[in-house]
From Swiss-Prot:
Cofactor requirement: Mg(2+)
Protein name: Fatty acid CoA ligase Acsl3
Tissue expression from the record: Predominantly expressed in the brain, and to a much lesser extent, in lung, adrenal gland, kidney, small intestine, and adipose tissue but not detected in heart or liver.
Cytoplasmic side of membrane: 42-720
Transmembrane segments: 21-41
Keyword Cell membrane tagged: no
Domain of life: Eukaryota
Species this chain originates from: Rattus norvegicus
Misc. remarks from the entry: 5 rat isozymes encoded by different genes have been described. ACSL6 corresponds to isozyme 2 (ACS2).
Recorded name of the encoding gene: Acsl3
Amino acid sequence: MNNHVSSTPSTMKLKQTIHPILLYFIHFIISLYTILTYIPFYFLCESKQEKPNHIKAKPVSSKPDSAYRSVNSMDGLASVLYPGCDTLDKVFMYAKNKFKDKRLLGTREILNEEDEIQPNGKVFKKVILGHYNWLSYEDVFIRALDFGNGLQMLGQKPKANIAIFCETRAEWMIAAQACFMYNFQLVTLYATLGGPAIVHGLNETEVTNIITSKELLQTKLKDIVSLVPRLRHIITVDGKPPTWSEFPKGVIVHTMAAVQALGVKADVDKKAHSKPLPSDIAVIMYTSGSTGIPKGVMISHSNIIASITGMARRIPRLGEEDVYIGYLPLAHVLELSAELVCLSHGCRIGYSSPQTLADQSSKIKKGSKGDTSVLKPTLMAAVPEIMDRIYKNVMNKVNEMSAFQRNLFILAYNYKMEQISKGCSTPLCDRFVFRNVRRLLGGNIRVLLCGGAPLSATTQRFMNICFCCPVGQGYGLTESTGAGTITEVWDYNTGRVGAPLVCCEIKLKNWEEGGYFNTDKPHPRGEILIGGQNVTMGYYKNEAKTKADFFEDENGQRWLCTGDIGEFDPDGCLKIIDRKKDLVKLQAGEYVSLGKVEAALKNLPLIDNICAYANSYHSYVIGFVVPNQKELTELARTKGFNGTWEELCNSSEMENEVLKVLSEAAISASLEKFEIPLKIRLSPDPWTPETGLVTDAFKLKRKELKTHYQADIERMYGRK
């Protein structure tokens, strides 16, 4: 079974090769500078050390199955952000009145776009972007009001569904606010979904209107419009595409600007609209789904408000000075919740994309600035995949440094790790060693929030140290409106997801098959159940699945059965230690946690991604591996192998060489012998949401991966 061990600073240090005398001298200089420059801090240092160790949550009773609550909500769970603001339109109205002329949504103008031919012959589009252009709270309110009224003029009815299938951008949020105001039920679909999944979502929700972009209309929607018979109006947020002849009769394409103009021209008496109730559906959010077809989760106004109330309480000093960079899919509950938290607190939201995020991003022309360099955000959300990439890229740069530079970086890294464990800061290291790393994300980040999947302890510690800011790891599901837990910003422990938010409570349910019990010693363990106002209404048109995953207790409180296995630390913080669906019983009876195997190996420089696989008909684990091209090519060179990238990945000799590296790392990570992959398949192609092999949060889609690699599974298990 999964015996989780928290990483300690001493076990996570980087190796250094510096002369002891020089090491002592540098330590002396750093310590002297720190003391002389930050003496006032040292008077407060003791209280800083105590904070991470205080009790953050505790059970509400002495029973083993008792729910844990934040110490700040023992007398009752929070459900409202501002008094009287019990629906999302009221929250936005409150924010609009308070921050009326303040900047809210920002977008960069495209100054130039050109094709750039790569050495391998591929053509990449590169852009040069200008400064951010901003809309104020008042601007956004007026545009949303006009858009909602225009949709009403097109026949959109209150409590009827309307879909949005669009990239993350200002128009997405404007459209969402319009729907919240007019009580239209917003159906959200990931921009990376494939045709069958899009058709399923649109037909299941019976939408007649859809909001999209010109690019998605041309590349994805136009091929499936004929399969959505109820569709009548397509609204593009960024102008009309050039051709219209291919659309079925009865389908009309409008621009967002035209619909807003229609709303402005309407008679005054027609501008009245139905106000939502707290219990009304605000969003039907289709999950990208790590298993099966996407499911629509029904999320009410009260669900979202409870969720953002809990999240906002975990971000200190949240307010008008903050700038948030929005680039994750707004169809993901993490991004939507984060942006609504910011909107309700006067923060600016500048829009970006994974392709334009940093100076080195794939669409940014060399020599021009990425979005973080221009926006200089203070707040940012990320999924572990993105943080892992940053970690690997920086460490690759460190390995390419001169011996002196590399040792200086490692010395500063290890020194800061020790100081963090004591609750102290390292101003000299931050100013002179880590400044350039911080600049990768603009230089002003003060809080990084990670969610969507587990974050490795190594990556979390790296981000803490090199970006000189806390990394809040959160845990939540679409079914809990993204809310569950978030670590407190001064808690630098790794491998945990924090205490329950003030909007919810969490308890652990025994799982006998897996051997997890809430009476376990030294800490209670079991399946995580989340209860509170943030727990959603269930799955759209799927009563059986709703009954399986949700229930109400004797007090009428709604609970979600997550399928994740957790463990509570003595201070009330939760660890995610397993997942019921990831646990496989081998032929000989041993249980293997596939997620545990992947977590132990995925941060190797040689590995870009890995999926472990096993079944009960065989006695060993196998794996599918996306290798890092630079690292694998170098490994092949040192072993005397030549060939193209595809030839290296298809080489049984290279499979064996990579397997040796994995086995050594697995032993170092204390994996059991039966947990170590015995055979692997190297994949020359990366797994992206577009391939359908991972979700938009880059979680593995095990069913799709199994289908994709079925021939390799049979080969590795010896079947013809």
